[in-house]
Design a protein with these regions (language model features):
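Conserved G1/Walker A P-loop phosphate-binding module
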Residues: 1-58
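A general secondary-structure boundary signal
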Residues: 41-43, 73, 224
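C-terminal-of-GTPase-core extension/linker across diverse P-loop GTPases
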Residues: 1-11, 78-220, 225-227, 232-233
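Amphipathic alpha-helical transducer elements in NTP-driven molecular machines
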Residues: 19-23, 36-39, 51, 66-69, ...
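Conserved nucleotide-binding/hydrolysis micro-motifs of P-loop NTPases
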Residues: 22-23, 47-48, 59-66, 131-134, ...
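Switch/coupling subdomain of P-loop NTPase systems
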Residues: 49-80
Length: 233
């Protein structure tokens, strides 16, 4: 995941670990040689349009709106075709009310129409305060949540690890976060909910208590699920 920071002092650029306490809890219950937190890539304002999510100080949110409004008005001034013109006018109306384009319901065709536009507020925008920057761990977790990301855990043997996926991802999609070969050969997902894992006192104990479920590729992953994927090699 890539986070675009619009001049928010105190948020470091580059790759950053998101220290999810649930992985810490899992690491205490299941021995492994290594613990790996999920990572995000933080880029500055000059690369923000390439990011999945935009982060801005609350007092500067209007700057993003004005950037997009200027872009939309410029496009309208070039006499676009009717379909584009109607969509641009819809976006203009929202921006003039200081809203974000991400709040507009669009058809797949409309999204395709503007896929090449350089718009900021079509992405999830997370508004933060200066005080929040003092606790980067909590801030990164909120940014992920507000941007529609969750994680799942894999534990045991060589590594205990948390993997980032979009909320609503299927088990098949989640397996691809680990390796494309696992996704291609997907058979079933062994799933233990995080609460069941903690209450049982570990992965082995949860299995013995009958808390492990076999799920198909269509299963919707839940936040902090423990997963092991069976696949054809």
């Amino acid at each position: 995941m890539k986070i675009g920071v619009m001049e928010v002092p105190g948020i470091p650029l580059g790759r950053q670990n998101v220290k999810d306490s649930r992985l810490d809890q899992a690491d205490k219950l299941v021995q492994a040689k290594k613990k790996t937190y999920p990572q995000v890539e933080v880029v500055g304002a000059e690369d923000a349009l390439e990011a999945d999510t935009i982060v801005v100080l609350k007092e500067n949110r209007l700057d993003l709106v004005l950037k997009d409004l200027e872009f939309v008005e410029t496009r309208l001034g070039r006499a676009p075709e009717e379909a584009e013109k109607n969509l641009l006018n819809k976006m203009k109306a929202v921006l003039e009310k200081e809203g974000f384009i991400s709040g507009i319901e669009m058809t797949p065709g409309e999204r395709e129409l503007i896929s090449g536009y350089g718009l900021f507020t079509i992405k999830p925008v997370v508004e933060v305060s200066s005080e929040e920057v003092e606790n980067l761990t909590a801030l990164f977790i909120r940014i992920l949540q507000d941007s529609g990301f969750i994680c799942f855990l894999t534990v045991g043997d060589k590594e205990n690890r948390a993997w980032l996926i979009k909320k609503g991802s299927t088990a098949w999609e989640a397996s691809g976060a680990i390796h494309s070969d696992i996704q291609k050969g997907f058979i079933r997902a062994e799933i233990i909910s995080f609460n069941d894992f903690i209450q049982a006192g570990g992965e082995t104990q949860a299995k013995q208590a009958g808390k492990m479920r076999l799920e198909s590729k269509e299963y919707i992953m839940q936040d902090a699920d423990l997963a092991n994927f069976r696949f054809n090699k």
